[in-house]
From Swiss-Prot:
Glycans are attached at N32, N169, N368, N404. Sequence repeats lie at residues 56-66, 70-80. InterPro entries: HCII_serpin_dom, Serpin_CS, Serpin_dom, Serpin_fam, Serpin_sf, Serpin_sf_1, Serpin_sf_2. N-glycosylated; different glycan composition appears to lead to two forms of this protein (56 and 60 kDa). This is Heparin cofactor 2. GO terms for biological process: blood coagulation. It comes from Oryctolagus cuniculus. The record marks L444, S445 as: Reactive bond. The keyword Signal applies.
Amino acid sequence: MQHRPHLLLISLTIMSVCGGSNGLTDQLNNKNLTMPLLPIEFHKENTVTNDWIPEGEEDDDYLDLEKLLSEDDDYIDIIDAVSPTDSEASAGNILQLFQGKSRIQRLNILNAKFAFSLYRALKDQANAFDNIFIAPVGISTAMGMISLGLKGETHEQVHSVLHFRDFVNASSKYEILTIHNLFRKLTHRLFRRNFGYTLRSVNDLYVQKQFPIREDFKAKVREYYFAEAQAADFSDPAFISKANNHILKVTKGLIKEALENVDPATQMMILNCIYFKGTWVNKFPVEMTHNHNFRLNEREVVKVSMMQTKGNFLAANDQELACDVLQLEYVGGISMLIVVPHKLSGMKTLEAQLTPQVVERWQKSMTNRTREVLLPKFKLEKNYNLVEALKSMGVTELFDKNGNMSGISDQGITMDLFKHQGTITVNEEGTQAAAVTTVGFMPLSTQVRFTVDRPFLFLVYEHRTSCLLFMGKVANPVRS
């Protein structure tokens, strides 16, 4: 009789309602979207956002950051020489980007580097005209959790792709646990209340009843990622219903049926949920929204709902990559970068060369001027199994029956699903999701109008931590 391997499943659910109260209220008032209360045993004290306080009743800061962030936790280290095993080019870029950055910012630089590579892997698997949407911080967090239980070559592959090894090699003061501690700090920095936006995250760890998980693994994911191991029966249809109700609650009723079915052989599931709602600093007047042409390619044009506003916006023109960059700010220190190639054919080059260095170059070369901005409304709903994309990036043993996950369980365990699901809505109210030099750049001094009428990239950053929250491509605004 052939032995069937134990399965590990990772599921990430992302909801980004970019500022839009329109549509959100309607959906929340929909009687078909009732959110039944969850039994106590289903969701224990396992996340920093477990207890949802009604809007308007939040404390100014529901976390005691003074205890969590000691004075020396986020200081600027002197960068030591990197390991000679690193390539000179890679080491130089890492050192250059790390200069003047806090530890959390350095971690997020490498998280973004991983995200851009993952984006390219997903793009290579998709149709050229497909929209793309991912939440890098959720993916990095889930992989960070799993890496706590990996050993040998399996561990090395994951750490290499996530660039954790580059981080450790950058300073003699850094070690692997430094990274996990920074993920803990990052969670507390990001998911706070009353910053003018809503950003929530939940990490859940479900374990099949009677399946033995190492106590040290459970302790570490609890300490660094706030995930308390919870017993579950994956063969019971009631589990899927309960999990979906939980996701429905976390995402304010906007993501339904996230889990359609679970393989009965699954022994462990990691569920990461992120919800974001932000409001533009410069809103788009609803009465200004109008039908406008959007060029899909050299031959096809579609009509889109084009929003329009006027105000002071940061923007730059990158002559090297032949694109325009606009920063749209949300209330509270989060912003969306809109990147539009000059030519329709320029998207491939832009996607291929997108790096943290390029983004930093854009941000440091922007000028603040009064501009008229035209941006299409869009809503993206994407669902990915990231396994093949991660394999193409070099993470192969994690999804192989011979992968070493002995730090999770003494019994054999393998992973065959890494689910990533997200939704982002952008409307008039907001969203409801190289060397520093001016060479090759020029201010948009003569361009009074910034019109987004062709496929574009978007990147959502939290500025204090330099965290890339969301990114994607809008190839066709009328499709999800």
